[in-house]
Amino acid sequence: MAKRPAATSSNDELPFATEEPVADERSFFGGRPQNPTAPNARAALPASLSGPEHYHGHRERLRDRFREQGDTALADYEILELLLFRLIPRRDTKPIAKALIDRFGSLSGVFGAPAGLLTEVKGVGENVALDLKLISTVAHRTLKSEIRSKQVLSSWSSVIQYCHAAMAHETREQFRILFLDKRNVLIADEVQGRGTVDHTPVYPREVVKRALELSATAIILVHNHPSGDPTPSRADIDMTKVIIEAAKALDITVHDHIIIGKDGHVSLKGLKLI
Protein backbone atom coordinates (compact mmCIF):
# COMPACT_ATOMS: atom_id res chain seq x y z
CA MET A 1 0.00 0.00 0.00
CA ALA A 2 1.35 3.42 -0.93
CA LYS A 3 2.29 5.64 1.97
CA ARG A 4 -0.02 8.59 2.54
CA PRO A 5 1.54 11.97 1.73
CA ALA A 6 2.06 14.18 4.74
CA ALA A 7 -0.30 17.13 5.18
CA THR A 8 1.10 20.43 3.96
CA SER A 9 0.02 24.04 3.85
CA SER A 10 1.62 24.67 0.45
CA ASN A 11 -0.81 25.93 -2.19
CA ASP A 12 0.93 23.68 -4.72
CA GLU A 13 -0.15 20.50 -2.93
CA LEU A 14 -3.46 18.78 -3.60
CA PRO A 15 -6.04 19.07 -0.80
CA PHE A 16 -6.59 15.30 -0.74
CA ALA A 17 -4.90 12.83 1.59
CA THR A 18 -6.74 9.68 0.59
CA GLU A 19 -7.80 7.72 -2.45
CA GLU A 20 -11.34 7.38 -1.11
CA PRO A 21 -14.13 9.68 -2.42
CA VAL A 22 -14.53 12.92 -0.49
CA ALA A 23 -17.76 13.21 1.48
CA ASP A 24 -18.23 16.95 0.92
CA GLU A 25 -20.33 17.50 -2.24
CA ARG A 26 -18.56 20.80 -2.84
CA SER A 27 -15.44 18.92 -3.86
CA PHE A 28 -17.44 17.33 -6.66
CA PHE A 29 -19.90 20.00 -7.73
CA GLY A 30 -18.40 23.26 -6.53
CA GLY A 31 -16.10 25.23 -8.76
CA ARG A 32 -12.82 24.59 -6.96
CA PRO A 33 -10.25 27.15 -8.15
CA GLN A 34 -7.17 25.68 -9.79
CA ASN A 35 -3.67 26.73 -8.87
CA PRO A 36 -2.20 28.27 -12.02
CA THR A 37 1.26 27.14 -10.97
CA ALA A 38 0.16 23.51 -10.96
CA PRO A 39 -1.54 22.93 -14.32
CA ASN A 40 -1.12 19.16 -14.09
CA ALA A 41 -2.49 18.87 -10.58
CA ARG A 42 -5.85 17.55 -11.77
CA ALA A 43 -4.23 14.83 -13.84
CA ALA A 44 -2.42 13.59 -10.75
CA LEU A 45 -5.72 12.78 -9.01
CA PRO A 46 -6.94 9.20 -8.87
CA ALA A 47 -9.60 8.38 -11.46
CA SER A 48 -12.23 8.22 -8.71
CA LEU A 49 -11.53 11.89 -7.87
CA SER A 50 -10.89 13.35 -11.29
CA GLY A 51 -14.19 15.19 -11.32
CA PRO A 52 -17.85 14.40 -11.90
CA GLU A 53 -17.79 14.37 -15.69
CA HIS A 54 -16.24 10.92 -16.07
CA TYR A 55 -19.42 9.25 -14.81
CA HIS A 56 -22.07 11.96 -14.50
CA GLY A 57 -22.32 12.25 -18.28
CA HIS A 58 -22.71 8.48 -18.41
CA ARG A 59 -25.45 8.64 -15.78
CA GLU A 60 -27.45 11.15 -17.80
CA ARG A 61 -27.10 9.09 -20.96
CA LEU A 62 -28.26 5.96 -19.15
CA ARG A 63 -31.23 7.81 -17.66
CA ASP A 64 -32.14 9.15 -21.11
CA ARG A 65 -32.06 5.66 -22.62
CA PHE A 66 -34.34 4.35 -19.91
CA ARG A 67 -36.67 7.35 -20.17
CA GLU A 68 -36.95 7.20 -23.96
CA GLN A 69 -36.71 3.47 -24.70
CA GLY A 70 -37.74 1.74 -21.48
CA ASP A 71 -36.12 -1.15 -19.66
CA THR A 72 -35.72 -3.29 -22.80
CA ALA A 73 -32.93 -0.97 -23.96
CA LEU A 74 -30.83 -1.72 -20.87
CA ALA A 75 -28.96 -4.81 -19.72
CA ASP A 76 -29.62 -6.15 -16.22
CA TYR A 77 -26.44 -4.61 -14.84
CA GLU A 78 -27.48 -1.22 -16.28
CA ILE A 79 -30.87 -1.39 -14.54
CA LEU A 80 -29.04 -2.11 -11.31
CA GLU A 81 -26.55 0.65 -12.06
CA LEU A 82 -29.42 3.14 -12.48
CA LEU A 83 -30.74 2.17 -9.07
CA LEU A 84 -27.33 2.40 -7.44
CA PHE A 85 -26.98 5.99 -8.73
CA ARG A 86 -29.32 7.06 -5.94
CA LEU A 87 -28.01 4.69 -3.30
CA ILE A 88 -24.35 5.63 -3.95
CA PRO A 89 -24.60 9.19 -5.33
CA ARG A 90 -20.95 10.19 -5.71
CA ARG A 91 -19.27 7.10 -7.08
CA ASP A 92 -18.99 5.21 -10.34
CA THR A 93 -21.55 2.44 -9.77
CA LYS A 94 -21.05 0.51 -13.01
CA PRO A 95 -18.30 -1.77 -11.59
CA ILE A 96 -20.40 -2.39 -8.48
CA ALA A 97 -23.48 -3.32 -10.52
CA LYS A 98 -21.45 -5.71 -12.67
CA ALA A 99 -19.83 -7.27 -9.61
CA LEU A 100 -23.24 -7.88 -8.02
CA ILE A 101 -24.61 -9.55 -11.16
CA ASP A 102 -21.44 -11.65 -11.50
CA ARG A 103 -21.66 -12.75 -7.87
CA PHE A 104 -25.38 -13.57 -7.72
CA GLY A 105 -26.09 -14.45 -11.35
CA SER A 106 -29.07 -12.23 -12.10
CA LEU A 107 -31.14 -9.28 -10.90
CA SER A 108 -33.43 -11.59 -8.98
CA GLY A 109 -30.36 -13.21 -7.46
CA VAL A 110 -29.08 -9.84 -6.27
CA PHE A 111 -32.38 -8.88 -4.65
CA GLY A 112 -32.84 -12.35 -3.21
CA ALA A 113 -29.38 -12.47 -1.64
CA PRO A 114 -29.02 -12.04 2.14
CA ALA A 115 -27.73 -8.65 3.25
CA GLY A 116 -24.61 -10.25 4.70
CA LEU A 117 -23.61 -11.66 1.33
CA LEU A 118 -24.38 -8.39 -0.46
CA THR A 119 -21.88 -6.55 1.74
CA GLU A 120 -19.15 -8.97 0.65
CA VAL A 121 -19.19 -7.24 -2.75
CA LYS A 122 -16.72 -4.35 -2.84
CA GLY A 123 -18.54 -1.02 -2.72
CA VAL A 124 -21.69 -2.36 -1.05
CA GLY A 125 -21.95 -1.20 2.54
CA GLU A 126 -24.57 -2.07 5.14
CA ASN A 127 -26.83 0.84 4.19
CA VAL A 128 -26.80 -0.06 0.49
CA ALA A 129 -27.51 -3.71 1.33
CA LEU A 130 -30.41 -2.63 3.53
CA ASP A 131 -31.82 -0.46 0.73
CA LEU A 132 -31.59 -3.35 -1.74
CA LYS A 133 -33.43 -5.63 0.69
CA LEU A 134 -36.07 -2.94 1.20
CA ILE A 135 -36.65 -2.77 -2.56
CA SER A 136 -36.87 -6.57 -2.61
CA THR A 137 -39.49 -6.46 0.15
CA VAL A 138 -41.56 -3.93 -1.80
CA ALA A 139 -41.47 -6.24 -4.82
CA HIS A 140 -42.54 -9.23 -2.71
CA ARG A 141 -45.40 -7.28 -1.13
CA THR A 142 -46.53 -6.12 -4.56
CA LEU A 143 -46.64 -9.68 -5.86
CA LYS A 144 -48.41 -10.87 -2.73
CA SER A 145 -51.08 -8.21 -3.21
CA GLU A 146 -51.86 -9.83 -6.57
CA ILE A 147 -53.07 -13.00 -4.85
CA ARG A 148 -54.58 -11.51 -1.69
CA SER A 149 -58.40 -11.60 -1.61
CA LYS A 150 -58.52 -13.45 -4.93
CA GLN A 151 -59.35 -17.02 -5.83
CA VAL A 152 -55.88 -18.49 -5.83
CA LEU A 153 -56.59 -21.30 -8.27
CA SER A 154 -57.72 -18.80 -10.91
CA SER A 155 -54.61 -16.64 -10.32
CA TRP A 156 -52.12 -19.50 -10.54
CA SER A 157 -49.43 -17.61 -12.46
CA SER A 158 -49.48 -14.88 -9.80
CA VAL A 159 -49.07 -17.53 -7.10
CA ILE A 160 -46.03 -18.97 -8.87
CA GLN A 161 -44.49 -15.52 -9.40
CA TYR A 162 -44.95 -14.65 -5.73
CA CYS A 163 -43.52 -17.95 -4.47
CA HIS A 164 -40.57 -17.69 -6.83
CA ALA A 165 -39.78 -14.14 -5.70
CA ALA A 166 -40.09 -15.10 -2.05
CA MET A 167 -38.17 -18.38 -2.07
CA ALA A 168 -36.08 -19.03 -5.18
CA HIS A 169 -32.90 -17.48 -3.82
CA GLU A 170 -33.13 -18.62 -0.22
CA THR A 171 -29.86 -20.29 0.77
CA ARG A 172 -31.63 -22.84 2.97
CA GLU A 173 -34.74 -24.93 2.45
CA GLN A 174 -37.94 -23.24 3.50
CA PHE A 175 -41.37 -24.86 3.87
CA ARG A 176 -44.29 -22.52 3.26
CA ILE A 177 -48.05 -23.07 3.33
CA LEU A 178 -50.77 -21.04 1.64
CA PHE A 179 -53.99 -21.43 3.64
CA LEU A 180 -57.26 -21.01 1.71
CA ASP A 181 -60.92 -20.67 2.64
CA LYS A 182 -63.83 -22.54 1.05
CA ARG A 183 -63.76 -20.13 -1.92
CA ASN A 184 -60.02 -20.79 -2.36
CA VAL A 185 -59.22 -17.24 -1.29
CA LEU A 186 -55.93 -16.77 0.56
CA ILE A 187 -56.34 -16.59 4.33
CA ALA A 188 -52.69 -16.71 5.33
CA ASP A 189 -49.23 -17.32 3.93
CA GLU A 190 -46.88 -18.73 6.53
CA VAL A 191 -43.38 -20.18 6.66
CA GLN A 192 -43.73 -23.34 8.71
CA GLY A 193 -40.09 -24.34 8.83
CA ARG A 194 -36.53 -23.54 7.79
CA GLY A 195 -33.86 -26.16 7.47
CA THR A 196 -30.49 -26.85 5.92
CA VAL A 197 -29.30 -26.54 2.35
CA ASP A 198 -31.03 -29.80 1.40
CA HIS A 199 -33.61 -30.59 4.08
CA THR A 200 -36.26 -28.95 6.21
CA PRO A 201 -38.30 -30.77 8.86
CA VAL A 202 -42.05 -30.97 8.22
CA TYR A 203 -44.60 -32.20 10.76
CA PRO A 204 -47.94 -33.20 9.18
CA ARG A 205 -49.78 -32.89 12.50
CA GLU A 206 -48.63 -29.26 12.87
CA VAL A 207 -49.65 -28.48 9.30
CA VAL A 208 -53.18 -29.77 9.87
CA LYS A 209 -53.41 -28.17 13.31
CA ARG A 210 -52.56 -24.75 11.89
CA ALA A 211 -55.10 -25.18 9.10
CA LEU A 212 -57.81 -25.86 11.70
CA GLU A 213 -56.76 -22.81 13.73
CA LEU A 214 -57.18 -20.62 10.65
CA SER A 215 -60.44 -22.33 9.60
CA ALA A 216 -58.79 -23.20 6.29
CA THR A 217 -60.51 -25.75 4.08
CA ALA A 218 -57.63 -26.11 1.62
CA ILE A 219 -53.87 -25.62 1.52
CA ILE A 220 -51.06 -25.36 -1.00
CA LEU A 221 -47.65 -26.63 0.09
CA VAL A 222 -44.55 -24.84 -1.19
CA HIS A 223 -40.87 -25.39 -0.57
CA ASN A 224 -37.63 -24.45 -2.30
CA HIS A 225 -34.53 -26.31 -3.41
CA PRO A 226 -31.46 -24.09 -2.82
CA SER A 227 -29.55 -26.22 -5.33
CA GLY A 228 -31.68 -24.59 -8.02
CA ASP A 229 -33.10 -27.88 -9.34
CA PRO A 230 -36.82 -28.16 -8.49
CA THR A 231 -37.04 -31.89 -9.25
CA PRO A 232 -38.89 -33.56 -6.34
CA SER A 233 -37.09 -36.13 -4.24
CA ARG A 234 -38.63 -39.37 -3.05
CA ALA A 235 -38.83 -37.81 0.41
CA ASP A 236 -40.72 -34.80 -0.99
CA ILE A 237 -43.32 -37.07 -2.58
CA ASP A 238 -43.72 -39.33 0.46
CA MET A 239 -44.04 -36.40 2.87
CA THR A 240 -46.70 -34.80 0.66
CA LYS A 241 -48.77 -37.99 0.65
CA VAL A 242 -48.63 -38.19 4.45
CA ILE A 243 -49.90 -34.60 4.74
CA ILE A 244 -52.67 -35.31 2.21
CA GLU A 245 -53.90 -38.28 4.26
CA ALA A 246 -53.76 -36.34 7.55
CA ALA A 247 -55.63 -33.40 6.01
CA LYS A 248 -58.21 -35.59 4.28
CA ALA A 249 -59.36 -36.99 7.63
CA LEU A 250 -60.41 -33.46 8.60
CA ASP A 251 -61.92 -32.48 5.23
CA ILE A 252 -58.96 -30.27 4.31
CA THR A 253 -57.87 -30.42 0.67
CA VAL A 254 -54.24 -30.27 -0.41
CA HIS A 255 -54.44 -28.65 -3.84
CA ASP A 256 -50.77 -29.02 -4.74
CA HIS A 257 -47.18 -29.10 -3.61
CA ILE A 258 -44.98 -26.67 -5.53
CA ILE A 259 -41.20 -26.92 -5.49
CA ILE A 260 -39.34 -23.72 -6.35
CA GLY A 261 -35.88 -23.57 -7.93
CA LYS A 262 -33.82 -20.62 -9.16
CA ASP A 263 -34.78 -21.21 -12.78
CA GLY A 264 -38.22 -22.71 -12.52
CA HIS A 265 -40.74 -24.69 -10.52
CA VAL A 266 -42.39 -28.10 -10.40
CA SER A 267 -45.97 -28.98 -9.48
CA LEU A 268 -46.39 -32.43 -7.96
CA LYS A 269 -50.00 -32.40 -9.10
CA GLY A 270 -48.93 -31.36 -12.58
CA LEU A 271 -46.54 -34.31 -12.66
CA LYS A 272 -49.38 -36.54 -11.41
CA LEU A 273 -47.32 -37.54 -8.40
CA ILE A 274 -50.21 -36.75 -6.04
From Swiss-Prot:
Gene3D superfamilies: 5' to 3' exonuclease, C-terminal subdomain (1.10.150.20), Cytidine Deaminase, domain 2 (3.40.140.10). This is UPF0758 protein RHECIAT_CH0001935. Pfam families: RadC. GO terms for molecular function: metal ion binding; metallopeptidase activity. Zn(2+) binds at residues 223, 225, 236. Residues 1-57 are annotated as: Disordered. NCBIfam families: PRK00024.1 (NF000642), radc (TIGR00608). GO terms for biological process: proteolysis. A motif (JAMM motif) lies at residues 223-236. Keywords: Hydrolase, Metal-binding, Metalloprotease, Protease, Zinc. CDD domains: MPN_DUF2466. InterPro entries: MPN, RadC_JAB, RuvA_2-like, UPF0758, UPF0758_CS. It comes from Rhizobium etli (strain CIAT 652). The keyword Secreted does not apply. Residues 152-274 form the MPN domain.
